[in-house]
Amino acid sequence: MSWSRHKSLQRIRSFRASAPAAAINLSNFDLSYMTARATTIQARRKAGGKSEPLIFDVPPDSAVLVEGVHVYIQLLDFASAMTERERETEASHRRVLSMLHLNYAACDQVAEEFEAQRVDFHGARMHAVIVSPPGPGNERDRAERALAFADAAKRAIEEVGRTTENGRYSTRVRVGIDSGSAVAVNSGTQDEREPLFLGAPANYAAKLAEGDEEGVFMSNRIRKDLGLPQLSSFDTLAAERASRTSSVGETGLSANTSFQSKRLSDAAIMTAASRARNSFILNVGTDANFSFHRHTPPLSTIDFALLTPSNSVRMGLMSIFGDIDGFTKYVDECIAAQRIGEMVSNLHVIRSELAATLSQDFLGRKVRFIGDCIHGLLATGTSYETDASGSVVASVKAAGGMRSSFELCQEELGGIENLGIAIGLEYGETPITRIGIRGDRSVRCSVSRAVSRSEELQGGCTGDQTALGPTALGHAPTSIRRLFAGGVAMGLDAGSVDEHLGSPPIVRSGEVSAAAAPYDSGE
């Protein structure tokens, strides 16, 4: 397993040729677009097909510019559900997967009531966007619908948690809401056809959803759209994150008959919760129906289409998060300068090359793209056990390869010279499965402390840093630990990893020094 500049360059040029900037088909989500899509969806349903969201199955060489309201729903008690007496066990992983399946179903039930576009489920987070009614002049209507949707989703999750298995899956809920322009693009994952939305409002809504206090938290842009007083502070985001909204008690909302008419009644919430519970019983039943097996490495051979709750993987592995640092700002610049084709083409190439580096060069498995971030898994070992130390070494090499591939993309592509890639790595027992709506709208799911920690580590890195988590450091050979002073390595690319692992350290004792034996992956 190794990175090759020649192979990477060939792939990058091939990916760019498949979706050149000049050939990107850009659409605007306006009334004509929505009407055409609604007609297509209705015709497919009459022919026996399934219903689809208004924006769906966007081709890799296309993009849709959307004015919408972005809603991030965070399950606050997700982390505690993942452990049992401070330890991750098969039982605790079954419980947290059941919890996610149940709450994903509740969110989907409510989303249908508001024509909310489900974007992504990722661990404890759901991202949805309200895109209709489209066009300027409808900002208030979209904001009212988004707030009513957020209120309904929170209540439905609380209701289904309260009434299922004596509250075993109950959780507090926090929701962040923001509005603005974003670009809908292909998800990059063949079996998940909902598009990803790139741009500031999705990012900002996610930040508003961060925190320990439950409730619904709006940006000043949403407050403005709703005609509510905006918050004034030196730190606007902090003020918004501390200002919980009451859908029924807040001045300006309780008397807003248009908004109140959009809120779901208690009876409708109970119906949505009941349908989610029935879906859970049909597809999962109980925790015990999540059945785990090991997958013999390499993980690149995992077929997500074959995974179900009763056919799930669980094993020790490395979780890898790679995030394109500075990309949201780049998206906003491209929207403002009408360079969306450039951005979509560049993203297609970068994501494709990062995924190819992980899976082809280092035999890892991509789970999904989350905006401009890639989540992957990697392990070495046998059908009986994971080689933890070998997995750490392989993932560090993969991280180095991903950075080298990204830097090669910067050489080949225009406009991305100011971007970087932040990478987080951690080791732990981790389940891998598909949950949610059965069929082509089920979602890939891999959750564990290692997954959460690797994402946190990536979030704390700058665009030239790679971070290795404490569990991975504990399994790492000395040669790897030397690379990560304080758990973080700067500018760690394929060349520097290979050079370091191939060069013996100097061992000193008193006045005597000597070269230690070189690292041997078989030791």
Swiss-Prot record:
Cross-referenced Gene3D superfamilies: Nucleotide cyclase
Disulfide cysteine pairs (residue numbers): none
GO molecular function: adenylate cyclase activity; metal ion binding; nucleotide binding
Known cofactor(s): Mn(2+)
Location in the cell: Cytoplasm
InterPro entries reported for this sequence: A/G_cyclase, Nucleotide_cyclase
UniProt binding sites for Mn(2+) 2: 323-324, 372
Superkingdom in the source lineage: Bacteria
Residues where a ribonucleoside 5'-triphosphate binds: 72, 125
Name the record gives this protein: Uridylate cyclase
Organism: Rhizobium sp. (strain PP-F2F-G36)
